UniProtKB/Swiss-Prot annotation:
This is Uronate isomerase. One of its GO terms (molecular function) is glucuronate isomerase activity. Pathway: Carbohydrate metabolism; pentose and glucuronate interconversion. SUPFAM superfamilies: Metallo-dependent hydrolases. Belongs to the metallo-dependent hydrolases superfamily. Uronate isomerase family.
Amino acid sequence: MKNFMCDDFLLNNETARQLYHEHAADMPIYDYHCHLNPREIAENRRFDNLGQIWLEGDHYKWRAMRCAGIDESLITGKQTRDYEKYQAWAETVPLTLGNPLYHWTHLELRRPFGISGILFGPQTADEIWHQCNEKLAAPAFSARGIMQQMNVRMVGTTDDPVDSLQYHRQIATDESFDIEVLPSWRPDRVFKIELAGFIDYIKQLEAVADVSIVAFADVLNALERRLEHFAAHGCRAADHGIENLRYAPIPDETVLNGILQKRLAGGILSELEIAQYTTAILVWLGRQYAARGWVMQMHIGAIRNNNSRMFRLLGADSGFDSIGDNNIAWPLSRLLDSMDVTDELPKTILYCLNPRDNEVIATMASNFQGGGIAGKVQFGSGWWFNDQKDGMLRQLEQLSQLGLLSQFVGMLTDSRSFLSYTRHEYFRRILCNVLGQWAEKGEIPNHKAMLGQIVEDICFNNARRYFALPGENL
């Protein structure tokens, strides 16, 4: 019987063990999509204690604590001490068996804290608290120190078009820190015309872009100025959170002007008008990304802020989101084709939150390959609720069956935590185990050099190549 969290955790055959330890374990991390706060990297934040670095902003843990019956004051309470929240988490962890949080918790204790051979829970919480806090006091456990310990080469943060990017600029000019921290363009608030805050957001966009917005062309002019600002700060990717994927044929500019002006006057748009405006913005943006060599990411299918009472209390990203079930195949097909028809579809990564859509995404990606770009349109890694063992397995198997696993750009943290880099380790172990199983069953050749190269490519090389800007030397 294998021990829990041993060196061969999740590696269930000899080929898997060789692939992981000889090829995957030491590969650098190219974390192309995350939600880290660039200010914390620029200022090299030091964390006061384990509770702070572990629980602050981590809605995965918050959801589990609520399920365990923990009082909300011990989860998000502003007056509650970090130690009290930490103790509540310690009470919760033994109840999470079968949930990836149990694995992640112990992986995060092992790396970077070096704590293994001990199960986290109420009985061990104080011992672990003191050990980790002692380490957090050292420079190697600052925000930057942890990134360096985890062999991170690049992180792509998530940034609004109105952001100044001052912290990215500060990091880029700091010669003492060699990890790339690049902005990613996230224009959700400009293409989601139906949202309550749209009018106020347009005023913000007007101010930062120095453009008066009264017509649709003014929106594009303002966005183009901000795209140039992001490009000047090294941006190479855009991301879009799309709860309800819409498509409508793009009308002429007179119609788009009318839609925008109606909305800015406080009017309520029809579903057709919303779809027309959204499609027009997304297609225009996609063409802009293609011209710049950027990667377009689409995260499709979440239902956000389901609990309106808790949304009023805590705001967004607090652990009250879930999987949607809208149909996506037809609007996605038409949206991508609207860019591709003029040969202006950018490199694209598609993520679906509902696993029933895996095959839809995998087969859709193959419709729009080309341009001499390996894996131009990608079926992205298991996202959010699929960011667990079974979800990763499903994505890997369906990608391999319906596309080319060898061209996959691999894992990302999609996290707000500096301790989440162990998710790359988790993914790598699962990847190596899958390939090892196939090889040892005789389903693929047990050719160590070939398999090792595929592992190294998926862990790092493919992403580095894929996100490179035109003419960039690797």
